[in-house]
Amino acid sequence: MKATWNGSTIAESDDTVVVEGNHYFPASSLKREYVTFSNHRSSCPWKGQAHYYSLMVDGELNENAVWYYPQPSEAAREIKDRVAFWKGVQVS
């Protein structure tokens, strides 16, 4: 699987976990040169608190396009140390 945005590969791995239709990639597959810090947080009733990264590719910013659960609930333990994408990031 590959995650792309603005013409660049953001992450690539054959080891993804699908939860609620989203592919969670290993955090180690994320190309850190495209990642910027975000203070954004959200909460899921069964997964826990999500943290976010933004993407910066060729001068274009995609805020909060990457999310992860640093301490997922026991029910969501399979997504620990994994990241998922939205906001126009194509996963195929």
Where are these regions (language model features)?
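Terminal leader/tail segments of proteins
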Residues: M1-S92
